[in-house]
Structure formats: structure tokens, C-alpha cells
């Protein structure tokens, strides 16, 4: 469960290392975001000499959360960190590589480019 002011790791090579959620896209008063939700975030830590810089406002899709994800078949997934992938307005990732495992639910939400770049899909 990601809410406003939550810090997340960035799971791609776009140049950002840490982001902070400032808004959840969807309903106007939505409190929590889960895997597959799009958020508006600000970059808190970035790699020097890259396209994305600190204090830049970006959109990101959540790919891992520490809160459990329950599937219909009874499997429960929980990751070690909260992580997101930075995307553009069309939903394509800004980076060219994805780090770490990605849940299968992203394919149902039409983030096929992110799923194809991921090294492992759980």
C-alpha cells in the first residue's frame, strides 16, 4: 500500500534512484495505491549526468510492494521493497532495463513493454 509521501526505489535505469509519491492517479480522494497503479512522484535521489534530475516530477507505475498481493488461486506474493518504474504519458518506460522481479498482474493492465523488459515475471 503506497500513499502520499511514501518513498520508493526505482526499478529501471532511467537515472532516478528514489522517488516519493505525491499523488495517486485515478479517483480524486484515493488513499492507497497497489501494484499496477500509476502515481505522480518527485525524484528524491538521482544518478549524476542522466536525463532525469532531482526534484523533477514524473509518473511511475508501481511494480513491487511490501504489502501482500493475494491472487485468486491462493498464492500470496510479498516483495522486500516498494519499487516503481518511471513511465511517460503513454505508459512506456523511460528506461531500457528493468531490475528485479515483476508480477504477472502488470500484463493484464497492459504494461506489456515493462513485462517484456523484466528479467523475471512471477
UniProtKB/Swiss-Prot annotation:
This chain's function reads: Binds to 23S rRNA.
Q: Which PROSITE patterns match?
A: RIBOSOMAL_L14
- Per the record, the gene is rpl14
Localized where?
Answer: Plastid
Name the source's superkingdom: Eukaryota
An example GO BP is: translation
Keyword Metal-binding listed? The answer is: no
Q: What protein name applies here?
A: Large ribosomal subunit protein uL14c
Q: Which GO terms describe its molecular function?
A: large ribosomal subunit rRNA binding; structural constituent of ribosome
Q: Which family does it belong to?
A: Belongs to the universal ribosomal protein uL14 family.
Q: Which InterPro entries match?
A: Ribosomal_uL14, Ribosomal_uL14_bac-type, Ribosomal_uL14_CS, Ribosomal_uL14_sf
Q: How does it assemble?
A: Part of the 50S ribosomal subunit.
Q: What HAMAP family does the record tag this protein with?
A: Ribosomal_uL14
- Give UniProt keywords alphabetically: Plastid, Ribonucleoprotein, Ribosomal protein, RNA-binding, rRNA-binding
Q: List, alphabetically, the GO terms of the cellular component aspect.
A: cytosolic large ribosomal subunit; plastid
